[in-house]
Amino acid sequence: GVNYFDTSPAYVQGLSERATGIALKRHPREKFFLATKLSNFSPSTHSREESLAMYHRSFRDLQVDYIDYLLLHGIGMGGMEALRSRYLDNGMLDFLLKEREAGRIRNLGFSYRGDIRIFDYLLSRHGEIKWDFVQIQLNYVDWKHAKEVNTRNTDAEYLYAELVKRNIPAVIMEPLLGGRLSRLNDHLMARLKQRRPQESVASWAFRFAGTFPDVLTVLSGMTYMEHLQDNLRTFSPLVPCTEEEFTLLEDTAQRMLQYPTVPCNDCKYCMPCPYGLDIPAILLHYNRCINEGNVPQNSQDENYREARRAFLIGYDRSVPRLRQANRCSGCGQ
């Protein structure tokens, strides 16, 4: 079954920890592992007072006496200045180390996105801090092509290798690249289905991430019971990818990157929009239409009218009109 639950004060409009605490309260505490984060992204929460309040609120909302895995959330976003303001200058990292020593935090780590210099800096302090784990984005596209997806990212191959050098276990986020690896276009999907016709396309991405021996666990954001059941089939037990399958997935990644999609992982860090746009939904609809061939190059394309109609009908179904891109003011926020 599933026994590792990942949450954050920032998820589900601030309600995720409370909901997680209610859901897990019925189970014996020793039967599950709970991961949450110090998500003090906003400058208004950088102070020691506000950061401490967020930390203690996590315990209250989760209804627990200790946290199994506590993460410095999203280090790398904002560079060294943000890292210093959020965790170093305010003494929060020192505080969390003392909390680990006291047993209220069982394992201390960080999740990484963005500036690679911050990742390298924190690993350079491993001898002093003794990171228990690190959460990285790893999937068969980001393994060698992270910068082709997002120029701010770093190849997972490098991130994972740096953790292995230091014997730091890796927790994997975005194994499906924000769901994109479960929504391949028909041609790419057919190539994987030909090899394993009874298995889902998503299972290939999970098997890829789970094959690496220093992976502690692979996170999965599941919406439906079918997702959970598919994941349980994939991991119980996990069948590691063969070298031939690694080659197939690398070829799939290269072919996928030829499609001009927007590098959106549906993380929702761009939300809320001050003008009410549903930014992730807009980008995901566009990407889906690209993969399905419903975005013509120009008005001279033979199938322009048909593709335009399919795009707009799907757009209205996917995104409420008051939240569509035509309401964007270009505010840059």
Model-derived features: positions:
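Short, acidic/polar
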Residues: 1, 46-62, 114-124, 201-206
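Acidic (Asp/Glu)-rich catalytic clusters
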Residues: 21-31, 59-65, 122-129, 165
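Beta/alpha (TIM)-barrel catalytic core signal, keyed to glycine-rich beta->alpha loops juxtaposed to Asp/Glu
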Residues: 75-277, 281-284, 291-307
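Residues at the N-termini of beta-strands
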Residues: 4, 66-69, 107, 133, ...
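Active-site groove signature of glycoside hydrolases
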Residues: 59-83
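Short Fe-S-cluster ligation motifs
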Residues: 292-331
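N-terminal binding-site loop/beta-alpha segment at the start of enzyme catalytic domains
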Residues: 1-32, 65, 95-101
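Structural motif corresponding to the early beta-alpha repeats
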Residues: 27-52, 73-76
